[in-house]
Amino acid sequence: MITSKIRKALLLTVSLGLAASIGVSGPANAASDNKNDINPKPASALKQGGTFVHVVVDLCPQFNTGQPAGNLLNCSQVMNTMLPGVNYFDNKATLVWDANYVTSAKVSKVKGKQTVTYDLNPKAVWTNGRKFGLKDFVGTWNARNGTNKAYENTSTIGYEDIESVKKGANDDQVVVTYKKTFADWQAVFNPVYPAELTASPDAWNKLWLTGPTLSAGPFEYVTTDKVARTTTVKRNPKWWGDKPVLDRVIFKAVPQVAQIDALLNGEIDFMDVGNDINAVTRARGSDKLRVQIAKAPIHEHLTFGPVTAVTEDVRVRQALMLSLDRRLIAKTIQGPIMGDAAAENNNHVFLDGLYCNQDNTGDLGKQNVAEAVKRLEAAGYTTVGADGIRSKGSQRLSIKLIYPSGNVNRANTVLLVQAQAKAAGIEIVPTLIPSAQYFVAPNVTSWPNGKYELALFAWVGGNYPISSVSNLHKLGSPQNHGQIGSAAVDALFSRANNILDLQKRCKLANDADKLQYQAVHSITMFQRPNAVAVNKKVANFGAFGFTSIDWTKVGFTK
């Protein structure tokens, strides 16, 4: 089983976590230089067995990754060993159908409607012995299409465009018919959830709160130990594909500030160092570790929570963006890792490494304190206090910015933002949140549960940017934390999702993005590489970037 590094919905991370025509040649959105860095070795060159200790920032609170509480990188990392998906991205970031589950997928027009026919691997089964098949596809669609609002969802995109999911010519064929064209159809059913989980809203929302009861991957769930702070998976004896090299994978929760010591002491086998220059320096100085780097769809940003009396005025949001020298921040924070390549990110949708990338920031992209002041005065913030902070009547121009503990890079970013914003008369109040509480209410959680004003975190994207990112901007979507958007933006993204011409899709998505920059939905800071420090004895694991992980091949060299 090969699992997408990131599934269709974007994932939150505190770790510091198409084809142009309808076909399977994609992704047309990926650039040609998206190489991974994983120390590739043939399975025959590896020791058979062993336990890989995979660090996570916290225990997963909800193992259903399609449910908002499970929309976390640490949950996806665990479930990627167990959940089936229809395709993956190989070492060249090219889409490939996963023959462990789908032997072929063909798209056609039937009575004028887009129709996808999946031929399933007849050997595929869940750990309860039930065959992987139509019931799972139907259940996944029913749970995720938005028809029944009791199913709490991270995203309905793609599924809401499906008209029917039916049996094909035999029991191993599934036919999906769309109501209207959906360009990123290859992203749908990644993953496929078991019918037992999708049987009812109660099952969907609660059944996997303490652990996944079923697997159809090379590993199966064993236990979660809240004292040891670990989740363990082991080889799935019912797995029909290539035998995994490893016996077990332990996902161990370690605060980020303590991860480099744990890695150097051999307690874990890797850590993400992309947001911790101190860890990079120490890892590079160790003869036991390898630092691996790959371009990746990860971007740091300042996102507004539900708007307040201060942040509801778009002129205030625009002024904050204008007050920031995002390039200086990028070079200060990312320069030690990326060198001269460190730069600000100017596109919410298409990051560097994806086709259609362009600068959509307009007149807000470069620091302009004078213009920031002008917009603040137009918004009524004309009084300047002795401390340099502006006010409008009794309302002080103050914004609380939350950030997670144990993250040096984020702490430094917040200090830079605070200093630069003050030059325009905006008070940024840094508010440290324990990392274990950062992605739970009332902090960075799906709308309307998150109650923060402004937060610093990263979105981890993937190779289907239009369909996945549109969910972050759609009004009413739980992932649009501040509900900043418009009907015009929704319409542009909807059109981009429902046509096949790549050039037209890109233009529509970029037009939507330009509107969102003017609305200051969020302030994109910089794109981070996938940078990890790994035990030198580990093979087929590391910086995956835009490619997928094959958990059957991960292991230790002889």
In which residue ranges do the predicted regions lie?
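Extracytoplasmic/peripheral linker and loop segments enriched in polar/acidic and small residues
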Residues: 40-45, 427-439, 467-536, 558
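Surface-exposed binding/hinge segments that line
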Residues: 45-47, 117-119, 153-202
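N-terminal lobe/hinge region of extracytoplasmic solute-binding protein
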Residues: 52-109, 142, 214
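Periplasmic binding protein-like
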Residues: 54, 129, 275, 419-479
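Gly/Pro-rich hinge or "lid" segments in bacterial periplasmic/extracellular proteins
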Residues: 73, 91-92, 190-244, 248, ...
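Aromatic- and charge-enriched surface segment that lines or borders ligand/interaction sites
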Residues: 104-150, 175, 310-312
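Extracellular/periplasmic solute-recognition and catalytic clefts
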Residues: 144-154, 166-168, 222-234, 250-308, ...
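Structural transition elements
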Residues: 324, 341-385, 405-412
